Amino acid sequence: LQEAGIPYDPDLVVWFHTEDRRSKPSMMVKEMVKTGSLPHGIVCYNDQIAVQVIESLEDCGLQVPKDISVTGYDNSLYAQRGTGITTIAHPQERLGEMAAELILEKINGVSEEDSRVERLIQPELIVRGSCRRLK
């Protein structure tokens, strides 16, 4: 956000517990539509939540991406539904390798300071049909 010159507004972040994942996203979408406080886009913490958000928006008579953009995260099979959800793919195989390397270091008594395991991953933006460019 900062790099794009967009100020962070904590009031625009919807927090919920995992056990609320079936009801809270839909409830919040309906509340935003009802109050007219719909943003240009909604960023979801995974693709499954993005599907729920899109379905809730469609239930409210809105079209994605014509009326609002939605993104997910994790490039799961959910992201490939319909016209597809724009998402962030993370290198799952590399994450597994890193986890194994960290476990081996722990077993061998390597301290956190002496660790040679890189902890930075390169995500990939996959643009699909759930987002549009703002004019």
Where are the regions a protein language model picked out?
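Bacterial carbohydrate/catabolite-sensing allosteric modules
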Residues: 1-135
